[in-house]
Amino acid sequence: MRRSPPEISGYRGDRLKGMYEICGEETAARILKSGKNEIMEAIKFEKVNFSYGGEEKDSFALRDVSFSVEEGEFVAVLGHNGSGKSTLARLVDGLLSPSDGKISVLGLDAAEGKNTFEIRKNVGIVFQNPDNQTVASIVEDDIAFGPENIGIPREEIGRRISFALDAVGMSEFRHSTPSRLSGGQKQRIAIAGVLALKPKIMILDESTAMLDPRGRKEVTDVVLKLNREEKITVLLITHFPEEAMLADRAIVMNRGEIVMQGKPADILCREDELETFNLTLPRPVQICRDLRKRGLPIEDVLTPEALGEELFCALEARRKAVSPSEFASSENGKAGLPAEEIPLSENRQRNSSAEGSHFSKTAETDVLSTEAEERERKRDESVGQIDCRNLSYIYNAGSPFASQALNGVELTIEAGEFFGIIGHTGSGKSTFVQHLNALIKLPTAEKKYKPKKLKKGEAPPPLVKLTVDGYDLTDKKTDFRELRSKVGMVFQYPEYQLFAETVFADVAFGLKNFSKEEPKEEDVKKAVRAALETVGLDYEEMKNRSPFELSGGQKRRVAIAGVIVTKPEILVLDEPAAGLDPLGKREIMQLLHKIHKEWCKTVIIVSHDMDEISENCSRAAVFSGGRVIASAPPSELFLSPDRLTALGLDVPFTAKVTEFLAGRGIKILSDFTCRDFVEKVSEYAGIAGGEAHA
C-alpha cells in the first residue's frame, strides 16, 4: 500500500512530491536520499557576502546569503531599491566575485577561473539600462555579438537573430541604429541579444521597466515559454506584481539579506512583513482590504478578473440580503447621491476647465510696441503653456536610416496642468518632449536656415507652430538659453545627468550656467539648499558628498534638484518613476506634486504606468505613430480599454475591474483612481464610508 508523500517544502519539494506520485515510493525515496542528479541545482549560494569596498558589516551589499534555484525553476526576486538584488544577479553571472562564501552555477564553482567562460556562456543577463550593454552600431550586429563570441556557426546565428527579433517584436528594426531607437526599443534589443544566446539560465534585472505594457507582456510571454518548454532557469528581478505572479517562487531581499521566500501570491499579501522591509502591498490587495474594512466580504486577490468575481459575488449577496432602498441601482452606480454632490479633486476641477481649450487667448496687438516688447508681453501671458501645431521630425533625414518620429503633432497643454503623456514604445513621446526646450531644434530656428524654394505647382509645407512658456521655438531670434532655464528636463534614468564632484556643484551648475550675470555665492547656496530640501535631502549632509556614492533613489532626487534650482515654469520628466520600488514610486510622485505646488507652474510626465497617470494627472495625451490621437482627462481616456489595448497600452487596474463588472451587469462609475473606485463600490453597495488607503 502506498503511503502519503513525505513533507517537503519549497519548489524542490513540489517537484519531488509529483515524482513520488508518478514513480512510486521506491524511486522517490532514492531521489530524496541522494538529494542530487534527478533535480540539479542551477544556482547555489552558500553563506555569500559581498562588499563594494568597506570592511564594516554595514557596508556589505550582500550578507550571509544562502539559497538555491533548481534547474528549470522560475524565481522572482523582490526588494526595495538598494536591497542587493542587482548585486546578487551580477554574482551569478560572474561579473562580481564574492568577498567570501561559495557560489555554484550549473554545478561549476564560480570562484575557479577555468569555469568563468562556461558559466558566462550559459548565463544571460539583461540589465535595467540597455545603453550599458549595447556594443554595435547596427541592431543585428548587436544581437549577433554574443553568439559570435561563443562560437555559434554563421547560419545558426542568422536564425537566432530572426528568432530573437521576432520574439520581442523588433524585426522591422533589424538594420536600424540602436542609438536612434527609443528607450523601450533599446531594451527590447538588449533582451533579444540574450535570447539569441539561448542560455540555460536567464537573468532579467528590471529589464522590462522601460517597456510599454504590450512590450512587457510580449517579453514575459517569451521568457515564460522558454522556461516551460525549454526548461530554461529564470531569475526575474522585478517590481511588477503581475510579473512576480508568473514565478514558481518569490524571494524578498532587504539590506543585503534574504528575508522571505514562498509562493508569490502568499508573499505579496503579507502587509506587516512587506512594510517592515520597505515594500508596499500591491494596489489590488490594498483595494481588497479597503473594501473589506467597509464591510464587503472579499478575499485578497491580485488580478482584475479575480477581484471582479469577488465583487460580483459580494454585491449580489448583499443585494439579496438588504432592502432595495439600501442598495444602489446598477444603472447609476450611486447610493442615492446626486452627481453634483460628489466633489472632484482640485486637479480634476482644473482639468475640466482646461479640456477643450486648444488655443491660448491672444491679446490685441499693441502697434506702438517694439518687436522685442511684443514677444515679451505675449510670453508673460503664456507662462507655463505649450501650444503645438503640425510638428514633425525625422531622424537621419535623407539617409537610408531615415525614421519618422513625429508626424504632425497637435497638442495644447494649459498653464498649471499636471499633464501625462502615454503611448507605446517608439510612438514619439520622448522625441516630442525633447522639442520643448529645444534639445531638438526646429529647422526654422537654426541660424543658417533658409526657406526652401518651391517648384512650380508644389504646395508649401504646413505651417508649424510651437510656443513653449511664451517662447516661439520656430523663430531663430528666440533666446534658447533663457528658454532652457524656464523649461526643466529630467530624462529617463535622471541619475545619469549627474557629473560634478560634489552634490553642491552638480545642483548649482544650472543656476550658474543660465544666469546672465555671475550670481552671488550666498544666493547660490540659498537656492541649492532650497532645492535639496524640496526633494527631501539634507543640505548639510549632502552638499560635499560625491553624487556617485549615493543610492539610486538619492541620485534621482539630486538630479531633480539640479533641474528645479533654476525655478523653471515647466518641468518635464520622462519616466520619472521607472525602475523604482513601489514605495519609491509613491515618494517620487508625492515629490512632484510638491514641486508642482511650490516651484513649477506646469508639470509633464511621460509614463507607461496607467495607474500612475490616472492617480496623478489632470489630463493626458495618447501618442501613436508620431501623432496625438487623443487628449482628455484620464477618467475619459480609460473608458475605451479596447482601443488603448490595441495601441499596445494598458488601462488602470480599476478600469479592468470596472469592465469585468459591467459585463456582469454592474455599472460602477468612477474616475479610475483607487480611492474613488473604493468610494463608488461602497456607494453602490449602500455601505457607510470609511477611509480608503489605496
Q: What is each stretch, according to the model?
A:
Residues 78-80, 422-424:
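The feature captures the beta-strand-to-loop junction immediately N-terminal to the Walker
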Residues 93, 437:
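Helix-to-loop junction immediately C-terminal to a conserved catalytic motif
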Residues 101-111, 119, 445-475, 483, ...:
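Conserved ABC transporter NBD signature motif
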Residues 177-181, 185, 546-550, 554:
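Conserved ABC ATPase signature
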Residues 198, 567:
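Conserved catalytic motifs of ABC-family nucleotide-binding domains
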